[in-house]
């Protein structure tokens, strides 16, 4: 976990569910700082990052069932799936990470996975 010398500086991330059920991760920082922290957390979780684009604010991640922590959530799939995490700064100088299922299937297991992934990221702080 990222630790701080004072209680005032503790990073507090929140996870919200959208109308579609997909999770959104909220960092209390600007886009640049949130980008660094998100990358660190993905590395800590050993998430397979296929590609990243800091200017766009996107991470493309690969999830392979039966491999590590996330295999339990997507156990029926037999191939690697790629998802996009898009980081956007809002007017309050907070940043939101939006989970995008590139297959657009809106599968219930994928929707649940978005919340589980973001909960795991938030637990790193």
Can you annotate each of these PLM segments?
Residues 1-125:
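Ser/Thr-rich, low-complexity intrinsically disordered terminal regions
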């Amino acid at each position: 976990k990222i630790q701080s010398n004072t209680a005032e500086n503790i990073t507090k991330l929140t996870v919200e569910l959208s109308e579609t059920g997909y999770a959104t991760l909220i960092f209390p920082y600007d886009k640049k700082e949130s980008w660094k922290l998100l990358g660190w957390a993905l590395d800590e979780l050993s998430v397979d990052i296929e590609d990243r684009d800091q200017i766009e604010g996107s991470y493309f991640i690969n999830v392979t069932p039966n491999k590590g922590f996330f295999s339990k959530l997507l156990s029926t799939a037999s191939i690697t799936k790629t998802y996009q995490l898009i980081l956007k700064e809002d007017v309050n100088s907070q940043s939101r990470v939006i989970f995008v299922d590139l297959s657009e299937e809106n599968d219930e297991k994928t929707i649940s996975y978005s919340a589980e992934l973001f909960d795991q990221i938030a637990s790193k702080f």
